[in-house]
Structure formats: C-alpha cells, structure tokens
Design a protein with these regions (language model features):
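Expand to "…catalyze enediolate/carbanion chemistry for C-C bond making/breaking, isomerization
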Residues: 1-441
Length: 441
C-alpha cells in the first residue's frame, strides 16, 4: 500500500528541476506580429536601457536601489555594476526568452475575416523566423477563451494558425510551442482543448504532444470549483500531460473578485492568495509558475529631438516611476517563489532582467556561506549521531541555487564555489547531500 502511494506521489511531485525556465513571457497583438518581431523588440529594449541607464549608478538611481549596493567594497564589483553588466549583455544576446502571439485581450474582438487574416499572416511570419533561427527560445499563441461566446472563434483561430504554420515549416513545429488558454473556469474546457490539439497533431502528422498547454489562472472558478475544492490540480489533470505552465492573470482575477478598478494591483492581497493556491497546488510538479503583468508602462510622455529641460526631466520622472513599480512587482513575485512573469512592452525587459539578477546576486554571498556551513555541520553532526534540525533551511539554500541557475541569473560555477557539486545540485535534496557526504566521511 505504501509503495504504491509513495510511487504515485513521487510521480506527481518529482521536485523542482534544474532546467531552463524563461524569466518572462512577452506578448503582443497578433496584428503586430511580423517577420523579425523578436529582433525588433530586442533592439527597442536595448535602446531604452541605453537611454535611461547610461551606467550602473544611473540605473541604480532610476530603480531607487540602496547606496550600499552602488559602491560596495570595490565600485567595479559592486552589486549594481554586476547587475548592469549582466543586463546589458543579456539584452544584446537574448532580450526575449519567451514570446506569445496574442489573439485575446492584447488583440481584441474583430470581424471573423480580419482575425482569419491575422492568424494566417502571423503564422507565416513565425514560420519564416523559425526557419531563419530568429524566433525566441520559446514561443506560442494565446487564443480566446473557451467560454460559450468565444469558443468557436478560439478554436477556428487555433486551427488556422497551426495549419498555416505547419504548411510553411514542412511540418516542423517550433519547440517548445505553447497554446495559452485564458479565463479557464472548468476542467472540461482544458479537456476539450487537449482533444483538439490531438486532432490537429493527427491531421498534420506532427508528433504527439508537440503542442503544449499554458493555463491562465484568472477567474475565481479556476481557484475554487463549484463544489468548494481547489480546482487547479483538476485543470492540470484534464490537460493529459500537456500543461507545462500556469499563469496568474492578476487583473482579470482581481476583477473576478469584484475589486474596484482603482484598487486592482499586482500586490493586492487577493492576488497573493491566488499565488499561494497556485504554489501549494503545483510547486514540485512538472508545471511551472508564472506571474502576471505590470500595467504601468515606461513610456516617455514627451517625444522629439528638441525637448526642453523641463520635458526631459518629466520623461525621466515618468520612466523612473514605471521602472520602480515594475522592479518592485518582480521582486515581490521572486520573494513569493514566482521566477517568471509576463511583460507587455520591450521597455519593461531591462527591468525584468535587472530585478532577477539583483535578487539572486544580492543573496549569493550569504547563500554560499550558509550552504557550505550547513553541509559541513550536518556531516559532522551525523557522524556523532546527533540530530540535525536545520534541514528545511538547508533545503531552502539548495533551492536558491537551483532556481537561480534555472532562470539564468546564476551559473553552475556559482554553485561549485558554494561547495556543492553539480551532481548534488541535480539531486535537489539537501538531506541526500548530507547523507552521501556522511557515508563518504
């Protein structure tokens, strides 16, 4: 009985793995998606960062970071200098990690002929970029919801897009390719979409499960079912191993909670409640967590080449405020264990990377020292038969490195310098590390 139960548990909860997880998903309307969109977004992000962060001190000022992080022991190795250098390099090499062509809120409701046309044109553009290697590492589309009023339009767009994409790529779907389902309310919606994806794969002769699912948790019914049960596990189970990510739709969710528009916010307690339900439902499974958007855009109100000092100062203030709001929201997500989020505008990308790098780099030295000390003390204690009661803390430190490496903020060398081997890190278990070292000693 126990063996069967334990095996079932381990299969469902294999643990957090060291595997690449995007730090963001960038999405934009399907009508705007053209050949070279990823490169265009990258250049816009680089230009924005170069304009408003001329060096690490200016970046720190714009973000409102502590002065201690700017100076450090050696200004060339200060936290902000390291963050600045990594952000600049990241924007030049891979500014967009994950991209979604949007047929929902970022696109709107249009005439059928118009949406049909955009489904074709966006799919052709994606096919061309796929063949030239210009796509983001991860890509996909967001369809409309499968609610009664949009279900037919949603599946029609999906069919047109996938069919056109397959036609122009000789049957080679970009991998990973995610289909994002918004405003989920019932497992039946996920089940129907899963069956439809299977039919598309069979129709076009592409490998089974080439089309993955991403579920948006943005209704109260996606959190709690009509029978009062937590609904997220049932939604994932209905996806038949296709579901790879669950995304919090912050503003739709808070709206569904009947919260007034001027109080809807990334950090609203209702949003944190949803995050925690997602976390306890999915952490340790094969489904990763992704947070929602920041709706304050870093867009300068004054344009042109001959701006007055007042206009330039106004631009800087608006941009700095947007940076700080976005940075604060991302740091909030990271502290809660959400290492990925959605971005709306290329000007938000530098701040995404700055927040992720800052989060891990500011904690690196302390985590390294504590992990090394914990492992050493645990090994010694186990040799004399004493009980080691700080396993939870040790596991948290291991998780820090696992998550930092998975999102690209830390390197495997950072972990090696903390005294942990790559094999031990891939085991993801602090207790196993201690046990194995105790045996070897």
């Amino acid at each position: 009985l126990l063996a069967s139960s334990n095996n079932e548990f381990n299969a469902r909860f294999p643990g957090v793995k060291i595997q690449r997880q995007p730090v963001h998903t960038v999405y934009g309307g399907a009508n705007l998606f053209k050949t070279g969109t990823t490169e265009k977004l990258s250049k816009l992000a680089q230009s924005h960062f170069a304009t408003y962060a001329t060096d690490h001190k200016v970046m720190a000022e714009m973000l409102g970071l502590p002065a201690a992080d700017i100076v450090g022991d050696d200004s060339s190795h200060s936290i902000t200098q390291r963050v600045f250098d990594r952000v600049k390099s990241k924007l030049e090499t891979e500014a967009v990690e994950d991209h979604r062509v949007d047929f929902e809120d970022g696109y709107g409701s249009r005439a059928d002929d118009e949406e049909d046309g955009h489904a074709v044109s966006a799919a052709i553009a994606m096919a061309e970029d796929h063949k030239s290697g210009a796509l983001a590492r991860s890509t996909g589309i967001r369809i409309k919801s499968l609610a009664e009023e949009t279900k037919h339009r949603s599946l029609r767009t999906l069919d047109i897009f996938v069919s056109t994409l397959v036609e122009h790529t000789e049957g080679k779907i970009p991998q990973p390719f995610l289909v994002t389902l918004p405003k989920v309310t019932t497992p039946e919606q996920v089940d129907v979409l899963c069956q439809y994806l299977s039919l598309l794969e069979q129709k076009h002769g592409i490998p089974s499960h080439s089309l993955k699912l991403e579920l948006m948790i943005e209704t109260i019914q996606s959190i709690v079912s009509t029978t009062g049960q937590i609904n997220i596990p049932a939604l994932v189970d209905a996806g038949a191993d296709r579901v790879v990510t669950a995304v919090l739709g912050t503003f739709d969710y808070t709206a569904s909670c009947n919260i007034a528009g001027n109080y809807q916010d990334h950090m609203h307690p209702a949003a944190d409640f949803a995050r925690q339900i997602m976390q306890v439902s999915l952490t340790g499974t094969k489904v990763t967590l992704c947070d929602g958007i920041t709706n304050v855009m870093p867009i300068a109100p004054n344009r042109g080449n001959a701006l007055s000092d007042r206009e330039l100062a106004e631009n800087k203030d608006v941009i700095a405020n947007a940076w700080q709001v976005h940075f604060g929201n991302i740091m909030h997500s990271l502290r809660l264990g959400f290492y990925q989020g959605w971005d709306l505008n290329p000007a938000q990308l530098p701040i995404r990377f700055a927040a992720v790098f800052y989060f891990f780099l500011t904690g690196l030295d302390d985590a390294s020292a504590r992990l090394k000390a914990f492992i050493d003390k645990a090994s010694q204690a186990s040799l004399v038969g004493n009980t080691f009661d700080d396993a939870a803390t040790g596991q948290g430190l291991v998780n820090f490195f696992v998550n930092g490496i998975s999102c690209g903020a830390l390197t495997e060398q950072d972990a090696l310098e903390a005294g942990i081997t790559l094999a031990e890190l891939r085991d993801r278990s602090f207790l196993k590390i201690v046990e194995n070292r105790s045996k070897s000693d």
